[in-house]
């Protein structure tokens, strides 16, 4: 017997949860399938535990670098990593509980088993068949290992969250968000951490002026940055340490190797070939601006599509899809332009819109004007452990519409959200100039640049 629903959601990550709940709120009969822990990458091995670890690193930096400058004579007797890990997991467990309460409140049925397509509108789960006119694929992605000898001796970001102690010596290989964040956390928690990137700087999609500040801060406080370094081999030694070789003839021996060299979409293992759904050249599921795949009635969003691998993007896309399918908002869709983002580096980076380089490439240098301010945040200014903060506005045309806003420094991670609203609304430099600053704050620099 086939069980009938209005909406089947395959994947219990951020996008799937958001879409399932919104559809049920509009009266749809919804069932969600997830073979792992509810919450997906973000809650279990991504944003949430990463941010907890970043906060732990912030506490360490405060104690080691700034407490003395504020007059506190601090003696650190011990750092118990097990306590941090246990409290982190307890926090995640509470989030799991909130998801379950939300499902119950909205009437979302769920089965914590893997689903598998048997045809474009039917899935099999634990021997039962389920069908619906609308099926969402929100299966997320997974971290990759490089194809080099010995790569299996390293771990990925998933394995980072399984560590039971801070490694004495760590190599992090990669140049994106995950690599920079993990390396920064381990460095702050006391590991001798080395970050290896293949090209001339990490976070190459971010504004160069901002990343230059990050690179300078790494040179002062760590992690040790190695550029133009592409790993070629990993050897496991008799004492379980790892020796990594690079194409620039550099070698390093560490206790822990973390790969952060990219992610791939989860498109196998659930019968996708039975549907006829098309994949992109990169192996992601193709979906259009309305999250439609190539097969009517099947939709895809989040990391499995490779559009923007950010949790709030998946959440918003999922809700908009359900508004369109179950609340008669036929034009509802996510605007993927001007999405703000933050890197929880040390110090944090925030950005929305075009970098200076991309703005010039798109509109021509003659149409772009850039404003920039650099200063020492007050929190770090009392003693010798000063951090630089840089903020930047990229404007277009005579009316100086702000098409890019970028910052690095203490507190930037909490500043960027409010400014992103202004950018989405089309704010100009004059709008910022006409805004009275809040003093003394770091964010006032964005509205006082000349």
Curated annotation (Swiss-Prot):
Q: Which residues bind glutathione?
A: 14, 319
GO molecular function term, any single one: glutathione-disulfide reductase (NADPH) activity
Chain residues that bind FAD: 14-15, 34, 41-42, 50, 115, 303, 311, 439
**One GO cellular component, as annotated:** cytosol
Give compartment(s): Cytoplasm
Give the cofactors, semicolon-separated. FAD
Which family does the record claim for this protein?
Belongs to the class-I pyridine nucleotide-disulfide oxidoreductase family.
Question: Any extra remark in the record?
Answer: The active site is a redox-active disulfide bond.
**Function recorded in the entry:** Catalyzes the reduction of glutathione disulfide (GSSG) to reduced glutathione (GSH). Constitutes the major mechanism to maintain a high GSH:GSSG ratio in the cytosol.
User: Know the name of this protein?
Assistant: Glutathione reductase
